[in-house]
């Protein structure tokens, strides 16, 4: 396999293409014998790689032919020309049975053929890995177009990469095992050579050992080849670094270098062997590489000088296969997920370099970046969310900082060949972190890689991938600040992968001593670019390096956390990162790159980043500012390296810490001061980057791994300052920063002058910085960084309120104080607890503050609320800073409110930018009433105050259903509501308005929010109540608005019509409709807002009823309560139907007065009052019950009938569960009542008016004891009473008072019976109306449906009526029998009991059979519905559904009314009979 010719595809590898074009030949191979064929395919167009054979199993059919070699590119299978897609090839291969005919394209130059890790293993490949690494770099097919100049490196990268990619796919399953990774093919697609691939790039060249691919896979973290990191894998940082090291070591001035000089691409390939690889894969690779352990291995290799020696691509790989250990290292790190973070940084560096070298492939790089991002994300998730999230974030930050610190501090960098593990790791981590931040942005990683490469280049001379292609400025590509380049490249790569990579690619790559490189290579553009990038990075880094020193201490953790944060915090950091990068590019490109980048950062792909980019990146005037800002970022990064040094070496750590601290202090000042200082800082950090202390690398690989693991574990413990919750005082403390002025005064404030680029970056990174404060750029990183580990992200979803706290802690904390590593080290659990406590206090305080400062907040926030406005007037970064400050900048009030509601202000760091950008989009904040969690939407639409003062509650990623929170959160946080009722209301209003604003996000957001806040809570409250109801309803009614209004109506368990409309106007409108139709039911529903029964009771007392949003008259409510008592179920339907009227055809207009009369205390209006309410106890009911108790106490004969405590089974009891409850029916029917409104009979109204006691009667009717007594039981009781001796009745016990009470009870029951009868009449009208609707539906169905379908419809309707009546009949009979059994004498005759038991058994069986019929009927209903759905319009279908559901409900309701009336009549009879003896006396 080693001898196999390179698989690099000429057309893919620019460098390979030229020489390979002639050297390429087609080989026809025919295999026979059937599967398995014994070869492995990798790459494919879907991965942006050539379809290459990466491995040939020994002793396999493929090996027996001797014509097939690893690295061969498959052109045709079974005479079918391939389009280049791997799946296509796999299908064709699988479709081959006995014979398989392959046509492969082979390069005649064996030096290009990657060695097979599979065949050679680590040890076998070691000698060739150097070559293969180199080859990988140049053999990356995808590099061809992108890096033609660097043909050798690219060719190697391409061919090797393809192999490794194939291996990657082969070994994705091996990601879980380090060993397997070692033996498995790289995860990265051909284009995505992982750093592992990189590490074993030599091996890769030899054949992309499984180990490489395994590492690649692992680093990809479950990113499958489908995610294919394009050439990034081939040009993974590790591979690149290794190759470069080997190449440079062997020939620092070798032809490759000279080639680099003469041939920018070629030279780039050499000096940035890694770069060439990256270009093809840089987009993808950077992230995968970041994830890939090979990167770790790379820096592991960096420890080995020989490894770094990479002979010319054409030369045989002389360096020992050190890549293996590196890969193992990287893999183990990746396996641990912590070290993996490290490795990725290194790979990222390489990939960054690749990106830089990849200028031509920029578009492609972007695509790859996307893929890479996905892989990266997957990697973080799969290979180690902790690592990916924490490790990468921390490492990423450290990486950048390290680069910066190395460059700035001028810290001696180990021999490039001996890239410090920390350096590589940081680079990779940083890259990863940034990458994570900008997962969607693929480019970010690439820059990291290039920078790493630069640092890694052996001989102390970093090969800085030139970026001429991108910027057409080789100097820029090679900016001495390798770190800058990495940061810049990464920044760009993330956002402008192509641009950064392209310059690197385009520009000649020259191995320059690190010190020289930093200085000589640096040009104004370089500085500016690096600075800009550093600014962005810094912004990003600041997030990472909020506490440089602490980061240094916890550097590794931070890196891990940073990496993790990158993954999890990608949302915000990526945005910052991207924005920063955009800004970075903008300086050199006048932000044109930003535009290009914005393309990458498309609204669809990366909406948040897109908005952020637009917000800050689009300001061309700040390119310098960005540059200036960036150095501070680097300074922040310098601070980070401190943590990293912790990981790597105390000396390095201390040195870096000191340098970074100084640099950051000066640079933060400089950033604020101006571009020149920033540039100086940039130069410093570049120098720091250039100098990579060798001491930074552990003496041994194991040590590195252990250290990395430990760091990563700590980092994954979420022991990050970013995540550590800050006391509420931090919020308050940051309040200064929260203020715009303060924010601006902070690093952001300095940017106002540099509003465009610098502010942007500041905003992304510095925006966070503002929260930390001017002097605390690192802190800013913490706050702004808000990178959440995978776990944290998960928690953000599982415990949204805490996720807010998590974010908040970082955001707020940053300004007030710089976190120490210890803070960061704090366990996530501790941090979480702290967050909870803090958030609670903060929420409470914030709520109060909001109440006090709601309006001011609006004003303060309005500037931000109008994001477009803010964008134009104030740098988006300011807004974002505010957001980053979690609204701290906005104002303490807002922050408080945000804290109060979301406690996300700290979290906002990551999503603050998103929110800011979202706000800019003017998406109205959906005031998630102090909900326990909010999504990005919530953050954006936190509320009026929140929106205005972007209390960026990074509740959750926008992906999370923030809108689903609704006011649900209100019930969830009753305490909060209680504490901050005002705020809560405000929040509710905000939410409601936010919803309303959603329709008009641009203009309304601010105004509506302000208006609502201004409205303050009185009016909003009503609206909120309605809106909240709507929201709550959407929220499954679980979250009811605190106000009783919103309490679910028992009738429907749903909020009133308000549910569907945000405006109370709608409610009023509905109410009007109801008035025309049956306002009472609707009103009842609304009144029912109160806790079910309580609200019902309150219905009895209109004063108790909460004001209806629709302004329902309490009298009407009272009437409703009375009426509802009469007719509950249908009323519910009617109510909903009434609600529907506005939607559906409105009921015939009836004089509102007619329904209004319902105020008449009886259910004069269509007794469309729900029985549920009727069943509710009213004052009259209570009085009746009291009378009944008194009477029963004195006249035991009436106990069974009158005693409310006596439980008698009724027909409805047995029907329970068979048919949906009223609320369910209403929900299903969707309040679509097409029935004509029924006007209460004038007679009924008159009667009610005539009888002042009617209301009481109605109430009585609802809860009268006889309601709970079935007619059958009443008869039974009467019989039993008749059996009793008259003495009991006529005993002289009964006094006149008892007779009076009985008479009162009789009167009460009589009134109730009158109400029930009226309700029955109304019900009959409803039944008629429903039948009329059914007739209409039937006519329509008959016209549109086929005869057989129409027959099914008619049969179903007919059976529905029959089954319902059958169930009712059986239930009634069974209830009577059971009541009789329960009321048997103590010594009943055996015959009687036995007879009753037998009847009970038979009836029970019949009842069960009827239930089965009902189930069958339900199935038929679904069938009929499906049939009708194909014919009927939506409206007609809704009518049908309403008709069917109402039909059964009305039948049941009718039966229930009949039973109640019968029972009442029997009760009256019993009472009259009991009075007879007394009267006779």
From Swiss-Prot:
Keywords: Actin-binding, Cell junction, Cell membrane, Cytoplasm, Cytoskeleton, Developmental protein, Membrane, Microtubule, Phosphoprotein, Tight junction
Source taxon at top rank: Eukaryota
UniProt-recorded name of the protein: Protein Shroom2
Modified positions (Phosphoserine) in chain numbering: 236, 318, 330, 935, 959-960, 962, 1041, 1043, 1165
Biased composition (Polar residues): 189-202, 216-226, 252-263, 431-441, 1001-1046
Domain spans labelled PDZ: 26-108
Domain ASD1 intervals: 705-807
Species whose genome carries this gene: Mus musculus
Modified residues (Phosphothreonine): 963
Lineage of the organism: Eukaryota, Metazoa, Chordata, Craniata, Vertebrata
Domain note: The ASD1 domain mediates F-actin binding.
Entry comment describing in which tissues the protein is expressed: Present in kidney tubules and in the vasculature of many tissues (at protein level).
């Amino acid at each position: 396999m080693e001898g196999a010719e390179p698989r690099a595809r000429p057309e893919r590898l620019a460098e390979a293409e030229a020489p390979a074009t002639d050297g390429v030949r087609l080989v026809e191979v025919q295999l026979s014998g059937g599967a398995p064929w014994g070869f492995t395919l990798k790459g494919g167009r879907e991965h942006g790689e050539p379809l290459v054979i990466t491995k040939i199993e020994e002793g396999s059919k493929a090996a027996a032919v001797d014509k097939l070699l690893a690295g061969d590119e498959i052109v045709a299978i079974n005479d079918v020309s391939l389009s280049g897609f791997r799946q296509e090839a796999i299908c064709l291969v699988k479709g081959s049975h006995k014979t398989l005919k392959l046509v492969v394209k082979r390069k005649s130059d064996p030096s290009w053929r990657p060695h097979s890790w599979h065949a050679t293993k680590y040890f076998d490949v070691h000698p060739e890995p150097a070559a293969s690494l180199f080859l990988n770099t140049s053999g990356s097919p995808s590099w061809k177009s992108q890096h033609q100049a660097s043909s050798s490196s690219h060719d190697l990268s391409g061919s090797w990469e393809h192999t490794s990619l194939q291996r990657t796919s082969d070994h994705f399953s091996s990601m879980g095992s380090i060993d397997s990774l070692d033996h498995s093919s790289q995860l990265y697609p051909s284009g995505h050579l992982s750093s592992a691939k990189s590490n074993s790039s030599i091996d890769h060249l030899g054949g992309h050992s499984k180990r490489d691919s395994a590492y690649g896979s692992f680093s990809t973290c479950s990113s499958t080849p489908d995610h294919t990191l394009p050439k990034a894998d081939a040009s993974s940082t590790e591979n690149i670094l290794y190759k470069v090291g080997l190449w440079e070591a062997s020939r620092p001035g070798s032809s490759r270098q000279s080639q680099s000089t003469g041939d920018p691409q070629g030279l780039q390939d050499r000096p940035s062997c890694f770069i060439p690889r990256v270009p093809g894969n840089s987009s993808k690779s950077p992230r995968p590489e970041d994830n890939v352990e090979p990167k770790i291995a790379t820096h592991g290799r960096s420890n080995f000088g020989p490894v770094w020696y990479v002979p010319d691509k054409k030369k045989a790989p002389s360096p020992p296969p050190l890549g293996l250990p590196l890969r193992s290292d990287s893999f183990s790190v990746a396996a641990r997920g912590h070290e993996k973070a490290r490795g990725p940084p290194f790979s990222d560096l390489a990939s960054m370099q690749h990106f830089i070298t990849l200028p031509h492939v920029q578009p492609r790089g972007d695509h790859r970046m996307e893929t890479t991002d996905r892989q990266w994300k997957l990697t973080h998730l799969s290979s180690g969310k902790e690592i990916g999230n924490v490790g990468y974030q921390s490492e990423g930050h450290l990486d950048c900082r390290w680069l910066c610190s190395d460059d700035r501090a001028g810290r001696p960098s180990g021999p490039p060949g001996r890239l410090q593990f920390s350096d590589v790791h940081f680079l990779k981590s940083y890259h990863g972190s940034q990458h994570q931040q900008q997962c969607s942005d693929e480019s970010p990683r690439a820059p990291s890689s290039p920078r790493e490469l630069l640092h890694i280049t052996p001989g102390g001379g970093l090969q800085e991938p030139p970026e001429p292609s991108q910027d057409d400025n080789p100097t820029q590509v090679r900016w001495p600040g390798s770190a800058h380049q990495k940061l810049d490249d990464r920044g760009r790569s993330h956002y402008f992968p192509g641009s950064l990579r392209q310059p690197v690619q385009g520009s000649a790559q020259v191995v320059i001593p690190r010190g020289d490189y930093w200085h000589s290579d640096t040009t104004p553009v370089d500085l500016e670019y690096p600075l800009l990038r550093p600014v962005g990075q810094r912004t990003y880094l600041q997030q990472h390096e909020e506490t440089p020193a602490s980061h240094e201490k916890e550097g590794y953790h931070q890196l891990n956390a940073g990496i993790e944060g990158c993954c999890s915090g990608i949302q915000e950091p990526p945005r910052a990162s991207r924005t920063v990068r955009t800004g970075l590019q903008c300086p050199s490109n006048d932000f044109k790159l930003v535009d290009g980048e914005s393309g990458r950062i498309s609204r669809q792909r990366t909406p948040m980043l897109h908005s952020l980019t637009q917000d800050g990146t689009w300001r061309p005037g700040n390119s310098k500012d960005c540059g200036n800002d960036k150095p501070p970022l680097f300074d922040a990064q310098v601070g980070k390296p401190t943590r990293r040094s912790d990981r790597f070496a105390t000396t390095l750590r201390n040195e870096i810490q000191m340098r970074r601290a100084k640099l950051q202090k000066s640079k933060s000042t400089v950033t604020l001061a101006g571009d020149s200082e920033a540039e100086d800082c940039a130069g410093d950090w570049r120098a720091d980057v250039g100098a990579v202390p060798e001491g930074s690398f552990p003496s041994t690989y194991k040590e590195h791994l252990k250290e990395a693991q430990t760091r990563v574990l700590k980092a994954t413990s979420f022991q990050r300052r970013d995540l550590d919750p800050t006391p509420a005082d931090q919020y308050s403390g940051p309040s200064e920063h929260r203020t715009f002025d303060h924010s601006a005064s902070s690093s952001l404030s300095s940017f106002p002058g540099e509003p465009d680029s610098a502010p942007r970056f500041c905003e992304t990174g510095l925006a966070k910085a503002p929260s930390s404060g001017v002097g605390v750029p690192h802190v800013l990183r913490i706050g702004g960084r808000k990178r959440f580990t995978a776990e944290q992200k998960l928690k953000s979803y599982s415990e949204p309120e805490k996720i807010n706290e998590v974010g908040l802690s970082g955001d707020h904390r940053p300004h007030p104080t710089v976190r120490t590593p210890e803070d960061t080290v704090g366990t996530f659990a501790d941090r979480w607890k702290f967050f909870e406590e803090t958030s609670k206090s903060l929420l409470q305080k914030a709520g109060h503050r909001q109440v006090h400062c709601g309006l001011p907040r609006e004003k303060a926030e309005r500037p931000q609320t109008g994001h477009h406005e803010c964008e134009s007037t104030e740098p988006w970064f300011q807004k974002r800073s505010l957001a980053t400050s979690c609204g701290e900048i906005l104002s303490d009030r807002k922050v408080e409110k945000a804290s109060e509601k979301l406690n996300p202000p700290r979290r906002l760091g990551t999503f603050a930018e998103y929110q800011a950008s979202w706000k800019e989009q003017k998406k109205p904040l959906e005031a998630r009433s102090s909900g326990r969690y909010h999504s990005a939407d919530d953050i954006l639409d936190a509320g009026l105050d929140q929106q205005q003062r972007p209390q960026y509650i990074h509740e959750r990623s926008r992906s999370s259903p923030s809108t689903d929170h609704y006011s649900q959160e209100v019930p969830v946080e009753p305490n909060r509501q209680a504490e901050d009722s005002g705020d809560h209301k405000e929040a509710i209003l905000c939410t409601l308005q936010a919803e309303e604003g959603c329709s008009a996000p641009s203009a309304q957001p601010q105004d509506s929010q302000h208006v609502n806040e201004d409205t303050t809570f009185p009016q909003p409250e009503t609206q909120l109540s309605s809106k909240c109801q709507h929201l709550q309803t959407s929220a499954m009614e679980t979250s009811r608005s605190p106000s009783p209004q919103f309490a679910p109506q028992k009738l429907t368990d749903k909020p009133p019509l308000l549910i569907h409309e945000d405006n109370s106007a709608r409610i009023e409108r509905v109410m009007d409709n109801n008035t025309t139709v049956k306002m009472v039911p609707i009103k009842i529903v609304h009144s029912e807002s109160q806790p079910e029964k309580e609200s019902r009771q309150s219905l009895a007392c209109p004063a108790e009823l909460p004001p209806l949003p629709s302004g329902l008259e309490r009298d009407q409510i009272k009437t409703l309560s009375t009426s509802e008592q009469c007719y509950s179920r249908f009323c519910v339907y009617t109510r909903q139907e009434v609600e529907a009227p506005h939607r559906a055809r409105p009921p015939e207009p009836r004089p509102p007065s007619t329904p209004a009369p319902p105020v008449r205390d009886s259910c004069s209006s269509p007794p469309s009052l729900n029985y549920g309410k009727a069943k509710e106890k009213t004052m009259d009911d209570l009085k009746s019950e009291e009378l009944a108790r008194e009477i029963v106490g004195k006249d035991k004969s009436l106990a069974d009938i009158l005693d409310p405590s006596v439980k008698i089974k009724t027909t409805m009891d047995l029907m329970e569960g068979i048919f949906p409850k009223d609320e369910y029916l209403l929900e299903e029917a969707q309040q679509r009542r097409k029935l004509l409104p029924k006007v209460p009979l004038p007679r009924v109204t008159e009667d009610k008016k005539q009888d002042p006691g009617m209301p009481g009667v109605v109430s009585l009717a609802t809860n009268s004891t006889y309601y709970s007594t079935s007619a059958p039981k009443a008869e039974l009781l009467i019989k039993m009473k008749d059996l009793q001796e008259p003495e009991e009745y006529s005993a002289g016990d009964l006094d006149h008072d008892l007779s009076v009470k009985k008479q009162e009870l009789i009167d009460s029951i009589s009134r109730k019976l009158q109400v029930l009868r009226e309700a029955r009449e109304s019900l009959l009208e409803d039944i008629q109306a429903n039948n009329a609707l059914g007739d209409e539906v039937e006519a329509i169905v008959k016209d549109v449906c086929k005869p057989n379908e129409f027959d099914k419809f008619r049969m179903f309707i007919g059976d529905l009526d029959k089954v319902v009546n059958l169930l009712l009949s059986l239930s009634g009979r069974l209830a009577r029998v059971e009541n009789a059994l329960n009321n048997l004498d103590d010594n009943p005759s055996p015959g009687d009991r036995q007879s009753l038991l037998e009847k009970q058994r038979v009836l029970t069986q019949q009842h069960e059979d009827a239930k089965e019929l009902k189930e069958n009927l339900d199935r038929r209903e679904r069938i009929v519905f499906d049939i009708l759905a194909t014919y009927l319009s939506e409206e007609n279908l809704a009518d049908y559904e309403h008709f069917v559901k109402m039909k059964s409900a009305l039948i049941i309701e009718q039966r229930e009314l009949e039973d109640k009336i019968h029972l009442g009549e029997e009760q009256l009879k019993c009472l009259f009979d009991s009075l007879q003896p007394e009267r006779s006396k």
